[in-house]
Amino acid sequence: MSCLPVLLLLQLLVSPGLQAPMTQTTSLKTSWVNCSNMIDEIITHLKQPPLPLLDFNNLNGEDQDILMENNLRRPNLEAFNKAVKSLQNASAIESILKNLPPCLPMATAAPTRHPIRIKDGDWNEFRRKLKFYLKTLENEQAQQMTLSLEIS
């Protein structure tokens, strides 16, 4: 007995023509879930020792503005990627940060100011600013997801 008919059937089953097409909404949902999972994983790592000082959640207004500015998303991520290299025991966060660029929105204009500054080796500052940055990014993605679902 030949296995040729079985191979032909298998090829038909896995060929792209017979699979359900990916819609923009499906693709957006999948990418949003992946980004959300990466953000959650980083935040979990940020909650591990060394523990932050009491002023963990305090960010000045200028830092908040810089971290929320859409046109600074990529430069800010680059600043976090640079700063994470100066921290001990941060390799897990570093590897996730490297995968985060597809989650960032496209800049609509050139940045008008410098990205966030993070002191080398300062876990507390790094943690405080990165957590705010990630929460802002996550909120923005949730809003985009809601808008795309309303449109479709």
From Swiss-Prot:
* Places the protein is found: Secreted
Residues bearing carbohydrate: 34, 89
Q: Which InterPro entries match?
A: 4_helix_cytokine-like_core, IL-3
The yes or no answer to whether the keyword Transmembrane helix is present is no
Pfam families referenced in this protein's UniProt entry, alphabetically = IL3 (PF02059)
Keywords assigned by UniProt, alphabetized: Cytokine, Disulfide bond, Glycoprotein, Growth factor, Secreted, Signal
ATP-binding among the record's keywords? no
GO cellular component assignments: extracellular space
Its BP terms in the Gene Ontology are: immune response
Signal peptide feature range: 1-19
Q: Where is it made, tissue-wise? A: Activated T-cells, mast cells, natural killer cells.
The task this protein performs is described as:
Granulocyte/macrophage colony-stimulating factors are cytokines that act in hematopoiesis by controlling the production, differentiation, and function of 2 related white cell populations of the blood, the granulocytes and the monocytes-macrophages. This CSF induces granulocytes, macrophages, mast cells, stem cells, erythroid cells, eosinophils and megakaryocytes.
> Which protein family is named in the record?
Belongs to the IL-3 family.
What protein name does the entry list? Interleukin-3
Instruction: Identify the species of origin.
Output: Hylobates lar (Lar gibbon)
Q: What is the lineage of its organism?
A: Eukaryota, Metazoa, Chordata, Craniata, Vertebrata
